[in-house]
Amino acid sequence: MPLFSQHTARFSPDVPLEGTSSRELLKRYQPLETLATGGFGSIEICRDTHLRRRVAIKRIPLINGAGMPASDIMDVLREAHTAAMLQHPNIVQVIDFTHDTAYAYLVMEYVDGMSLAEFLHRVDGHSLTFDEAAAIADALGQALTFAHSNGVLHLDIKPANVLIDHSGNVKLTDFGMARLSSAGGFGGSRGGTIGYMPPEQLDIETGTVDERADVFALACVIYEGLCGSAPFMAATPADSLDRIIGGATYPSELIPHFPPGAEAALMSALSPMPQDRPNSIEAFCDQLLAGLGSVREGRRSLEQMVGELSDDEQELVLSVEGRADGIFTENGITVIDEIK
């Protein structure tokens, strides 16, 4: 009997994502707030004027400033299909997908809360309690076990891709680096985030990955949450690899009374060699949660803390009066009719 709790979820390999035209799809959304920007593009909070709910729209540039392709449309479509296939309470749902000549758009479930990265940045000590870490490990364990059982590796598990809502629910997002299994296995990786990738994922040219790459990354996230810093963060892949080979500092050297069983689970999952790690997310979470903390109390604590941190933050919501036909841009609002 696995120690982490189970939820009913559905795998839908034939979820339709028929590329509703950008004019038809985006016309219904009113921009409210820019949630994040970066090399991936931007994420905007928008109001769905039809269903009267908030959604998050990820806008991904297809052409960079030099006029060269920035993101292949097939890569974006692959991300949309992968996330849409996995319908699970701990995975952020993709609602729709479209593109025009300049951008691709993923319309996603809006999670009202914050990322684990923001949570750790703002909470006292920049770390989790044992109970909070147990709740996060339990939720991510369920999400990843479900994904793996349906032939999907995430390959970009990090605090920025873990969302916590006001009820203490934890959801995994961003399947942009995901790999789907085939008759020959998962093959190699297409990248990831330095500090959370194991050696086989860092080796983009010849390395091959499987479920144990996600085991490694999940262990990095839980280690960071408990100890206050990621064990293998570095400026370059080579430096990160050196840190991995050198081994992580034992948590008990950083935190008094660290549970021995949880420490053993983390150190095993952080092994440089895949064969030395647990063979599955389920096996890792069973060992980790056996001695870490209370999942139920952790969820209650996350709910309370996210509420308190959100109350301290002044919410900025852009006025949308007169912008019903608008779509976000980096510099404000562009009328939908101007998009070719």
Locations of the language-model features?
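Conserved short submotifs of the Hanks-type protein kinase catalytic core
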Residues: T101-S115, F119
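AlphaC helix of the eukaryotic protein kinase fold
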Residues: P61-M85
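Activation segment signature within eukaryotic-like protein kinase domains
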Residues: I136-A137
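Activation-segment/catalytic-loop signature of the eukaryotic protein kinase fold
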Residues: F97
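Protein kinase glycine-rich loop
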Residues: L32-G38, I43
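Protein kinase catalytic-loop region centered on the HRD/HxD motif
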Residues: G141-V152
